[in-house]
Amino acid sequence: MNIEELKIGDLVRVIKDDYIIQKGTICKVIGLSATDLSAFGGHKPVVSLLTIDTENIRSMSCENIEGIPLTKDILLKNGWKLLKHHERNSYDDVSWSSYHKPAETNISLVFYPEEEAFSLFLYAQEISETPIRYIYQLQHILFGLGLNSKIEV
């Protein structure tokens, strides 16, 4: 994962075991450093993590973390509701599901199965330049809009 993609507060998953944090552990980013020569033996970007379940703090290379896929279940757990579902009816048509958060009535997420990604809409206008596939991507957009970007996994 690239350090440029991350911000403090993002949720990520560890993909390589170390002696403190196990593979698959969900963590919150609490610090970012472009390089750390002492601990990692090179010019590798380093991220400081706080484990969600045990509240351990650990720094590790960005190579050892990945984004957590944004799923419909995670949206539902965080107060988003299925607003509308559309099935593909013709060759030119696409399937999609629209989700909104009642507390934030001006935003919605549309899931496109063909892309396996979401797009964010503000007042019915698409505002996400790239498909949203990971929790941290949604967190960045919500934060930029001044909305609550805290997400439970």
Q: In which residue ranges do the predicted regions lie?
A:
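Short beta-strand-centered aromatic/proline hotspots
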Residues: 11, 19-36
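Hydrophobic beta-strand residues in large extracellular and virion-surface proteins
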Residues: 12, 27-29, 47-49, 65, ...
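Amphipathic, interaction-prone secondary-structure segments
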Residues: 82-113
